[in-house]
A protein has these predicted regions:
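P-loop NTP-binding core
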Residues: 1-172
Length: 172
């Protein structure tokens, strides 16, 4: 059974991408089949995976060009698979919201979900539609934070959002 873990915190610089990449690499090192999804337009998880950002197909292409989800998956240099991020995800976030396609990502991942033991989702440092899509897909969420007031401040709001999402069916 595929375990889907979102790495989320609306504050930037708290270690979301570092956690996501290292968790994916560690699980892959133990012979687990791992998919890392980079939902951050900065694309740092993509870069860390050894993928050149300008030579990729991602969820943007899947949404706008009907590219198959399988064609969005790349092999990382550390043995896990990755669906890359990049700046075009900004347009995807707006389109999902404007087209009222909440739950798009969950539906998109169905055909490949059984191919992996773990799916790790690296979310952007904002509470936008891409983050909500990632949280909706997840069966669990890791919230990295620094031991400082401003890092802790947003955790309650994020936990309330996670609870709200878990009580709603976005795919209807």
């Amino acid at each position: 059974m595929n375990k889907v873990i979102a790495i989320a915190n609306q504050k930037g610089g708290v270690g979301k991408t570092t956690t996501a990449v290292n968790l994916a690499a560690s699980l892959a090192a133990t012979k687990r089949k791992v998919l890392l999804i980079d939902l951050d337009p900065q694309g740092n998880a993509t870069t860390a995976a050894g993928i050149k950002e300008n030579a990729t197909t991602n969820l943007y292409n899947h949404y706008f060009e009907n590219t198959s989800i399988e064609d969005c998956v790349y092999e990382s240099s550390d043995g896990y698979k990755i669906i890359p991020g990049g700046e075009e995800l900004i347009a995807l976030e707006i389109a999902i919201r404007n087209d009222n396609k909440q739950g798009f990502m969950s539906k998109s991942l169905e055909p490949i979900s059984l191919n992996y033991d773990y799916t790790i989702i690296d979310t952007p440092p904002t509470l936008n539609q891409l983050t909500i899509e990632g949280l909706f897909c997840a069966s669990g969420t890791l919230i990295p934070l620094q031991c400082e007031y401003y890092s802790l401040e947003g955790v309650t709001g994020l936990m309330n959002t996670i609870e709200t999402i878990s009580n709603k069916n976005m795919s209807s």
